[in-house]
Amino acid sequence: MNALEKRSVFALASVYAMRMLGLFMVLPVFMLLGEDLQGATPALLGFAIGAYGLSQALLQIPFGMLSDRVGRKRMIYIGLVLFAAGSLLAAATDSIYVVIAGRILQGAGAIASVLMALLSDLTREEERTKAMATVGITIGLSFSVSLVLGPVLGAWWGLSGIFYTTAALAVVALVIVSRLVPTPHQHKTSADTHPAREMLGRVLSDGRLLRLDFGIFALHLVLTALFLVFPSMLQDQFGLATSSHWWFYLSVMVTSFFAMVPFIIVGEKKRRMKPVLCGAIALLTLATAGFTGVSGSLVAAWAVLFFFFMAFNLLEASLPSLISKEAPAASKGT
C-alpha cells in the first residue's frame, strides 16, 4: 500500500475501533449497573442491550445508498453525530426507557457499510484484501478491549460514565474523519461493497447465504444472551466485584484467541473449514450448556467461558469470510 492508502486504512480502522468500543463497553456491566435505572426489569435491560442492533439493521443499506448520492464522509458525519447524540441521551438519564431510546439512536448511526465503501474508494483493488483484513483485526481487538474497559470504567464512573466516554469516542472519530480521511474524487463502483437494488431479491432467496446469515444472527444472539446472565453470576455466585471483572475477561479473551488461531490455519490450509466450523458450533453448544453447571466454581466458569469464546471467535472470524465466498461477485455488497 502507498502512503495515502496506509493513512486511509489506519484512519478508517480507528473510526471502526471507536464505534465498536462505544457499543460494547456497556455489554459486560449493563445488567449489573442498569438495575438502578427507573423502571428497569430484566426484559427491558435485555432489550436495551440489543436495541442498537434493530435500528442498525434497518438503516445499514439506506445509509450505504445515500452515501452514493450525497457523499461518503457526509453520511459518516451524520452517523457519528447520531451515535454521539444517542450516547449523551443514555448518559443523561436515570430512566430505562430513555436509555433504550439512546441505544436505538446509537444504532441509527449505521455507518459500517459506508466506511467499507469509503475504504473501497480509497484503496486499489489489489490492496483491498489487506485493507479489509486490517479493519477486521481492528474490530476483533476492539471487542476484546471493550470487555476489559467496560468493568473498569463502570467501577469508576458508573453507567453514565461509560455512555459519556462513548460520546467522547464519537467526537474523536469525527475529528479523525475530518482531519485524516481523504475525500475521494469519485466513488468506485465495487461489487464487494456497494449494495445493488436488483440483487436484493436474488440474495434473499439464496438458501446457502440465508443459512450463513442465520448463523451470524444466532451467534450474536447467543453472545448477547450470555451477557444478560454471566456478569450477575460473577458477582452473585462467585463474589467477584464489578471492578475485578476486567482481569477475568482479559485472561479469557487472550487465551481463547491464541487457542482458536491454529484451527483456522489448519482449516484454510487443508481446506477443511466445514469440519472445523461444525466442531466450533458443537463446542459453542456444549459451552453454552456448561454454564448451567459452573455454580460454586470460579475455575469452572473460567474454563467454560474460555471454550465459549474459543468457539465464538473462530465462528466470528470465519462466517463473514464464508459469506463473501458464497455470495455472487455482483452482489457481495448487498
Predicted regions and their residues:
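Conserved MFS/SLC helix-loop-helix module at the cytosolic interface between two early adjacent transmembrane helices
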Residues: 58-94
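Cytoplasmic helix-loop-helix junction between adjacent transmembrane helices
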Residues: 102-140
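Helix-to-loop junctions at the C-terminal end of transmembrane segments
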Residues: 60-71, 258-272
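Short amphipathic helix-loop junctions that connect adjacent transmembrane helices
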Residues: 28-42, 228-244
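Juxtamembrane intracellular "pre-TM" segments in multi-pass secondary transporters
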Residues: 1-5, 182-215
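C-terminal membrane-cytosol helix-exit motif in multi-pass small-molecule transporters
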Residues: 168-187
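C-terminal transmembrane helical hairpin of 12-TM major facilitator-type secondary transporters
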Residues: 274-319
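Cytoplasmic membrane-interface "Motif A"-like loop-to-helix N-cap segments
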Residues: 69-79, 268-281
